[in-house]
Amino acid sequence: LEEGPYGKCVFHNDNDVVDHQVASLLFENGTTVAFTMCAFSDACDRTVKFMGTRGEIRASMDNNVIEVTQFGAGVRTGTTAVYTVKPGSTGHSGGDEGIMEEFVSILKGERENTNTIAQSVHSHVMAFAAEESRLTGRTVDVADFEKSVMA
């Protein structure tokens, strides 16, 4: 610890790992995404909120609850269904374990793989494009970025 990188203060070091990032994405079909990542917070929790024209979904890994609220024509505004989910016991609240279980099931022929390599590569390219935007301060067109990195 005294001589290696693990003994260095994370605040007074050459550490250049991003600790806060906001990315805005616009998809071809008009869907927008606002992604915020912050390493330093009183509540170190992963949360998601999906907002649509007829409802929204909110979830938090800390409270193991998914809330679905519907609104609009024919729906009583403010009606929320609450689903309690079993907390994960391994990395990423059980997500790592779930990925491995699905992978093994696919290898055993117990289920069909519905996720293509192309989908996986594209999702990674989007993350790399967000990082490129963070580093350069420019808006990045993902299609153009993908062409440049895949060439």
List where the protein language model places each region.
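Alpha-helix-centered segments that form part of catalytic cores
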Residues: 1-26
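C-terminal helical cap and adjacent loop that interface with cofactors, partners, or active-site loops
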Residues: 17-151
